[in-house]
């Protein structure tokens, strides 16, 4: 990936990649000199061929990979050395990464309990986010008892339940059929409009 300009707008910059590079072997750069500003409330899609560094860039932003060079800022603060669970970033993976041994409600409660919220707050947030993704009736089901679209909505709800300042999605619709993919694109668009 190469230099990308920031979109026009007056809102504040939420994410900034400054000269970010990533190499796994010390020789070949997967991400080369990425400079990108993402503004608060902006919906941004990274496009490129396989192997161009899209997922690697998301993983560095989320904290699952470390840049070889450069700096990543979140709300004006360097996060290069901040662990993933302290970045206030929700992430939806392509394979959804739901815990198969936990119910939907337990999957949603997990990021809240890790953050030390009390049971009452956890219960309220889980109910609210289940309603948001229209899965109220599925709270006690396990991921294997859900359709692909329902699993995708649970993964999205889990990324939103702790009210992060940023949500990242790595090909979240890739495993869905065309009709469901188009439906979920609209769902994500509506959620973005509501939540910013």
What are these regions (language model features)?
Residues 3-180, 184, 190-191:
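ABC family nucleotide-binding domain
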Residues 196:
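Conserved H-loop
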């Amino acid at each position: 990936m190469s230099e990308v300009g920031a979109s026009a707008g007056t809102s504040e910059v939420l994410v900034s990649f400054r000269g970010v590079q990533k190499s796994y072997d010390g020789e070949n750069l997967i991400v080369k000199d990425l400079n990108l500003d993402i503004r608060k409330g902006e919906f941004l899609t990274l496009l490129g061929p396989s192997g161009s560094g899209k997922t690697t860039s998301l993983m560095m932003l989320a904290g699952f990979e470390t840049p070889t060079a450069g700096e990543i800022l979140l709300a004006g603060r360097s996060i290069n050395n901040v662990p993933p669970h302290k970045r206030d970033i929700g992430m939806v993976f392509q394979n959804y990464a739901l815990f198969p041994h936990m119910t939907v409600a337990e999957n949603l409660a997990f990021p809240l309990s890790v953050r030390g919220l009390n049971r009452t707050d956890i219960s309220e947030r889980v109910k609210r986010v289940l309603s948001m993704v229209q899965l109220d009736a599925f709270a006690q089901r396990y991921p294997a008892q859900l359709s692909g679209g329902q699993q995708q909505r649970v993964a999205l709800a889990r990324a939103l339940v702790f009210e992060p300042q940023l949500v990242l999605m790595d090909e979240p619709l890739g495993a869905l059929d065309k009709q469901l993919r188009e439906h979920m694109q609209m769902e994500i668009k509506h959620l973005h409009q509501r939540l910013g």
